[in-house]
Amino acid sequence: MDKKSLYKYLLLRSTGDMHKAKSPTIMTRVTNNVYLGNYKNAMDAPSSEVKFKYVLNLTMDKYTLPNSNINIIHIPLVDDTTTDISKYFDDVTAFLSKCDQRNEPVLVHCAAGVNRSGAMILAYLMSKNKESSPMLYFLYVYHSMRDLRGAFVENPSFKRQIIEKYVIDKN
């Protein structure tokens, strides 16, 4: 087995078939200005202690937040194993990086705050990685977020796409 195949096998094996984690209900601060949450967290964003400048909505449903100055960016994504989420990684990670640099808080969410939004957050954190071992960093981030939130990027296709872009292609 070549090195890339081995890495992919180990990463997918160590993050799959785990005990079923419960869906998160709380919003999680990922970096100084990037937050991960679910649909309810987005609906509560206008009254949040965090003064969000943006909400990145990754559900299929478009909405507005009445009486709010929050800018909503909508990228409609289906949470299934056929969705090519990787085509959005570069744009979303660049946007989240700008939010962090400009001190503009952003909430990234999908319906449950697990797969679509979790994948974008994992891609963002992987894009910031300056470590020499992307495989170890992936496992560290994945398991740290799972410890914090419970369920996190359970969709095997989304996980595979992140591994291919940020781990396999980096080696």
UniProtKB/Swiss-Prot annotation:
Single GO MF descriptor: protein serine/threonine phosphatase activity
CDD domains the UniProt entry points to: DSP (cd14498)
Keywords: Host cytoplasm, Host-virus interaction, Hydrolase, Inhibition of host innate immune response by virus, Inhibition of host interferon signaling pathway by virus, Inhibition of host STAT1 by virus, Interferon antiviral system evasion, Late protein, Protein phosphatase, Viral immunoevasion, Virion
EC number of the protein: 3.1.3.-, 3.1.3.48
GO cellular component: a single term: virion component
Residue numbers annotated as active site: 110 (phosphocysteine intermediate)
Reaction(s) this enzyme catalyzes, per UniProt: O-phospho-L-tyrosyl-[protein] + H2O = L-tyrosyl-[protein] + phosphate; O-phospho-L-seryl-[protein] + H2O = L-seryl-[protein] + phosphate
Membrane-traversing stretches: none
Recorded superkingdom: Viruses
Signal peptide as annotated in the record: none
Residue span, Tyrosine-protein phosphatase domain: 23-171
Main location: virion
PROSITE patterns (UniProt xref): TYR_PHOSPHATASE_1, TYR_PHOSPHATASE_2, TYR_PHOSPHATASE_DUAL
UniProt entry tagged with the keyword Isomerase: no
Compartment(s): Virion; Host cytoplasm
Any one GO biological process: negative regulation of MAPK cascade
Family annotation (SMART domains): DSPc, PTPc_motif
Induction pattern: Expressed in the late phase of the viral replicative cycle.
Cross-referenced Pfam families: DSPc
Subunit and interaction comment: Homodimer.
Described purpose of this protein according to its UniProt entry: Serine/tyrosine phosphatase which down-regulates cellular antiviral response by dephosphorylating activated host STAT1 and blocking interferon (IFN)-stimulated innate immune responses. Dephosphorylates the OPG144 protein.
Record-stated family: Belongs to the protein-tyrosine phosphatase family. Non-receptor class dual specificity subfamily.
Stated name of the protein: Dual specificity protein phosphatase OPG106
Organism: Vaccinia virus (strain Copenhagen) (VACV)
Gene: OPG106
